[in-house]
Amino acid sequence: MVSLKTGILGGTFDPIHTGHLILADEVKNRLGLDEVIFIPTGQPYYKADKTISPAEDRLNMVKLAISDKPYFRVMDIEIKRSGPTYTADTLNDLKTILPEKTELYFMLGWDNLEALPRWHKASEIIRLCRLVAAPRIGQVKPDVDELDDKLPGLQQSLILLSKPEVDISSSLVRERVENGQGVEHLVPAAVASYIKKHNLYCRK
């Protein structure tokens, strides 16, 4: 059986933006992935004290953003899970759901890579997947040797990219909408229309 190479891009996607799509495309092309699965979070444990948009809206925006990319798809497994969302649990679920020979490539930013040794079941994460870490503009390159000391085996699992450097964030999109500014250059047109139609991120 031929192995499938599947990229995993998780996030709150509140909202999904062009930077997410650029990252997914870059990693897919560079590593020769067969597909990329977008996984919106349910209630992420690291944002438990913050208000995020309803899961249905975040899921719908991802569906709209990737609708013209046959090699992108979305799964709602974290949204359906009750309680906090943990990456290790999601990777274990994917190992059960996806074909047996599937190789997982989990995408994250350099900032999240720095924090990885403190994540829930971090050792299990690096056992279940390859890590693909990409920068955002202005971020300092992680000290991989130091991270490997904190989490042995991380370096062997890691693919450290120097690009794409994306200077877009969901918080920027939300802020611009709240201030009545356009976001058509930051999110796909269908997502911009959805935000407007459903009055997301507007001042209450």
UniProtKB/Swiss-Prot annotation:
CDD domains: NMNAT (cd02165). GO terms for molecular function: ATP binding; nicotinate-nucleotide adenylyltransferase activity. Its EC number is 2.7.7.18. The keyword ATP-binding applies. Keywords: ATP-binding, NAD, Nucleotide-binding, Nucleotidyltransferase, Pyridine nucleotide biosynthesis, Transferase. The keyword ATP-binding applies. One of its GO terms (biological process) is NAD biosynthetic process. InterPro entries: Cyt_trans-like, NadD/NMNAT, Rossmann-like_a/b/a_fold. Pathway: Cofactor biosynthesis; NAD(+) biosynthesis; deamido-NAD(+) from nicotinate D-ribonucleotide: step 1/1. It catalyses: nicotinate beta-D-ribonucleotide + ATP + H(+) = deamido-NAD(+) + diphosphate. Gene3D superfamilies: HUPs. Belongs to the NadD family. PANTHER family: NICOTINATE-NUCLEOTIDE ADENYLYLTRANSFERASE-RELATED (PTHR39321), PHOSPHOPANTETHEINE ADENYLYLTRANSFERASE (PTHR39321:SF3). Catalyzes the reversible adenylation of nicotinate mononucleotide (NaMN) to nicotinic acid adenine dinucleotide (NaAD). This is Probable nicotinate-nucleotide adenylyltransferase. It comes from Dehalococcoides mccartyi (strain ATCC BAA-2100 / JCM 16839 / KCTC 5957 / BAV1).
